Amino acid sequence: MLTFNSWDMVNWVSQFFWPFVRILALISTAPVFNERAIGNRVKIGLGVLITLLVAPYLPLNTTPIFSVAGVWLLIQQILIGVTLGLSMQLAFAAIRHAGELIGLQMGLAFATFFDPTGGPNMQVVARFLNILAILLFLTFDGHLWMISLLADSFYTLPISANPIISHAFLALARAGGLIFINGLMLALPIITLLLTINLALGMLNRVAPQLSIFVVGFPITLTVGIMTLGLLLPLIPPFAEHLFSEVFDLLADILTQLSSS
């Protein structure tokens, strides 16, 4: 006859609770999963489903939930999940940054897209590129790679109360440069072209002062910007694929550094 006491119950809950915390922290911060259009019940349900698939294969952790070690372990799992989720946001932030730079040069900085779901307002070009990045992320199975990396993190960085103080978080802070480098690389062709047009319009204004540069300049820069953005669209998928791959390599490096601390 099987016996089931309170201690077995605590061990069983702990076996599923700690992975659930890390998984839910990632879902709350990772791109696509953290969209406000996805309800909290769906996010929690997805977290429970992934936990049920992952937790049975993990080593047993007997750390009491209501203890000092349990509080530290809770904070640790939240930090790991948030680190993984925010690291993946770097790729989308780079693409949004490129959209803001392009919109600024096109004269569309005033055109802000209102998000009815309560998310942050963005410029029109930045919003368009962000939606395109989400579609490409799903097309490249980025969400599946992210879940796979999360599952591997339980083996690379097991659930334990050991300290994780490391320079890995400093590496994450330095990785913020990816936003500016990749964003500028994506927007640089359009920025260069529009800057050349603005210089030409400035010289034209010096030659013919009676020409209203504000009336002529805005339609020209807007039209050329839209046409150039259309020509740039076929180059965005390989750029986004390289960017996502770079961020996933960064995540793997951060997990390795955390596990070696």
Curated annotation (Swiss-Prot):
Major place of residence: membrane
Gene Ontology cellular component list: bacterial-type flagellum basal body; plasma membrane
Keywords: Bacterial flagellum, Cell membrane, Membrane, Transmembrane, Transmembrane helix
Disulfide bridges in this chain: none
InterPro entries assigned: FliR, T3SS_IM_R
Membrane-topology annotation of the record: Multi-pass membrane protein
Pfam families in the record: Bac_export_1
Transmembrane segments annotated in the record for this chain: 13-33, 44-64, 65-85, 98-118, 131-151, 153-173, 177-197, 213-233, 235-255
GO BP term, pick one: protein targeting
Span of the signal peptide: none
Compartment annotation: Cell membrane; Bacterial flagellum basal body
Keyword Transmembrane found: yes
NCBIfam families recorded: fliR
UniProt function note: Role in flagellar biosynthesis.
Annotated family: Belongs to the FliR/MopE/SpaR family.
Protein name in the entry: Flagellar biosynthetic protein FliR
Species, as recorded: Pectobacterium carotovorum subsp. carotovorum
